């Protein structure tokens, strides 16, 4: 297994909470995406969004921000438009997105190693989208 980094573009709304908008594989594509989709063309501003998590405000109740997370890849190659799995710690009213996985087998191995208290049944339910008290798994298509 290989470990790299991916970028999550996360949308936050005061009523709906957080959701992942895009998963992008490299900084150049992220820069282009932010430049094309938001009224932010200043390189320093985009660098601050990427490097320091500075939010891009849409209005008083919603914004986007970027988070860089670990990506653990199995043997298969992940291409744009393939689904990747995202592990998140559930907090009071939000999520802390921690790691992205190339496929469910890699995710299951990770859960087995890092969360040995989870039974096989609990791991399979979690991967299938049935969250536990502390963890949640989602999946989204890789943008680029």
Language-model-detected regions and their locations in the chain:
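Short, mixed-charge low-complexity intrinsically disordered segments
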Residues: 18-19, 36-82, 95-96, 111-144
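Ordered, small/hydrophobic-rich secondary-structure cores
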Residues: 1-45
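Short amphipathic alpha-helices within nucleic acid-binding modules
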Residues: 30-33, 106-111
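Short aromatic-glycine-(Arg/Gly/Cys) micro-motifs in beta-strand/loop hairpins
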Residues: 2-19, 76-96
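Non-transmembrane, interaction-prone segments in cytosolic or luminal domains
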Residues: 7-9, 26-27, 92, 103, ...
């Amino acid at each position: 297994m290989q470990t790299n980094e991916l970028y999550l573009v996360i949308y936050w709304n005061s009523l709906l909470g957080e959701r992942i908008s895009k998963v992008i594989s490299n900084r150049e594509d992220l820069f282009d995406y932010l430049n094309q989709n938001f009224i932010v063309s200043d390189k320093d501003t985009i660098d601050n969004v990427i490097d320091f998590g500075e939010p891009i405000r849409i209005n008083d109740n919603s914004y986007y921000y970027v988070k860089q997370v670990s990506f653990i890849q199995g043997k298969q190659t992940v291409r744009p438009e393939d689904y990747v799995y995202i592990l998140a710690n559930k907090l009071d009213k939000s999520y802390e997105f921690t790691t992205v996985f190339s496929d469910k087998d890699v995710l299951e191995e990770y859960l087995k190693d890092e969360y040995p208290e989870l039974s096989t049944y609990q791991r399979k339910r979690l991967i299938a989208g049935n969250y536990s008290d502390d963890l949640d798994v989602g999946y989204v298509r890789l943008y680029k």
